[in-house]
């Protein structure tokens, strides 16, 4: 189930994004970005609709998925 990021309390959203950034370990190119810069980049992805907050009812977990990686038909998640 997709959760509108605007409906999430600001502190909770910040923590969710921070966890996502730490877990992803994404390569940001030759220039190293600060943790806060990476958080701002993910916020921009959410605002632009290029990422979404997803709740799995099956696993009772919340995650951020990029639009490119999101697959509502995945069999190991209960996305709607």
Curated annotation (Swiss-Prot):
A Pfam family reported for this protein in Swiss-Prot or TrEMBL: UPF0270
Gene3D superfamilies: YehU-like
Coiled coil: none
Top-rank taxon, per record: Bacteria
Record-stated family: Belongs to the UPF0270 family.
Name of the molecule in the record: UPF0270 protein VSAL_I0295
Provenance organism: Aliivibrio salmonicida (strain LFI1238) (Vibrio salmonicida (strain LFI1238))
